[in-house]
Amino acid sequence: MYLRFWGTRGSIATPGRSTIEFGGNTSCVEVVTNSGVRIIFDCGTGARVLGAHLMAHGPKPLAATILLSHTHWDHIQGFPFFAPLFVPGNRFTVCAPKGAMSTLPEVLSGQMEYTYFPIELTQLGAQIVYRDITEGTHEMGDIRVSGQLLNHPAIAFGYRVQADGASLLYLCDHEPYWEPLWHSDSEPGKMESILHEGDRRHALFMKNADVVIHDAQYTPEEYPAKKNWGHSTYSYVTQIAAAAGVRRLFLTHHDPTHDDAFLTAIERRAQELASSMGSSIKVSCAREGHEESFQHEAHDKTAVTEIHNKDTSHAGSLIILIVDDDEDLRILARKALMRTGHVVIEADNGEEGLRLVESHKPNLVLLDLNMPGMDGFEVLRRLRARENGRSLPVIVLTAFGDEESARTSFQFGATDFLAKPFSPPQLDARVRSCFAHAEQ
């Protein structure tokens, strides 16, 4: 399997003398299997450079699958400048997770309206098939592609590609589900020591991968001011990848403010962190233009997580029960959820919440912990004791952002734990992720 980075920057392109080594173009990665199957991850501004290269040196006609992690601008802004799209006879399949409000062609055509661009999407000469991709494993030629929702304020997917006996993951954009990563009373660096179920699931997705390309936009010092923006720190990524048994790790989606000297320092700190954990993982910051071929090196592959084909595209029409005594919170959550097509019912106390579970059969529950009378822990305990409540997805929404509250919530059966405050897009993404994984 062949890999090349065409864009490594996050948020906005950052050309200039201070970004020559690591690159200034936004996200775009090319992977080619031994049999010639070509996959392109994301179409940031790096896609323009890739397109020019393929026009000069690529096969004629050209065929490729484009896997978009999500449709934020820095991941699609190179799409109209990808020259092979204009060539009749070329064939492309463009895949992305289904959004809540618009179809993939609508999103891509939005940036190509005449107000912004001289050519519309319908004028492209190549044959283009658009496909909403769901969580699960998909066969694409001689490769297997597995998709999994990431923790991001928009619906974003990470991808695991298995081909030529090797595995590669592309994970942009993703934020830790919880900080710190580890249980305080357990040994760091082990899968079972991960505190939040979401982070453990993320680690399982990476389990024993040969190559992982992961968003690592921030330093630990920068992260508190950027929390809920949907990006990781190099320390989180290095630790979780090492715990997952990853062999090769590329840190990418570099912050626009991080010049070459800064990224060199981040690379060194990440390598020192991996070494301090006793890990053999090889860590690098992704460099635009870097290319290498790799193959599977023998180590245990038996623990790779199995991802079931569960369609999350219909998660925009769930019946969601909000149980919270804070009316302002209920209003905020109701507006956010109804905007994406959910049906919302509400209770301001635990007793009423349990009654509504019986009478309205919700698909998912948002549950506060601190309520008068019956607190959220007791609601969870009673809910899980009922036949119809054992597998019901429950997201705990609480101002208690401490480890003990998170740990106790999971012990009582919570599916996810989200500390207040949160953004509406973040809530929608977590609802989709929670619903998708509740039955796995």
PLM-predicted stretches and their roles:
Residues M1-H183, A203, D259-V304:
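Binuclear metal-dependent hydrolase catalytic cores
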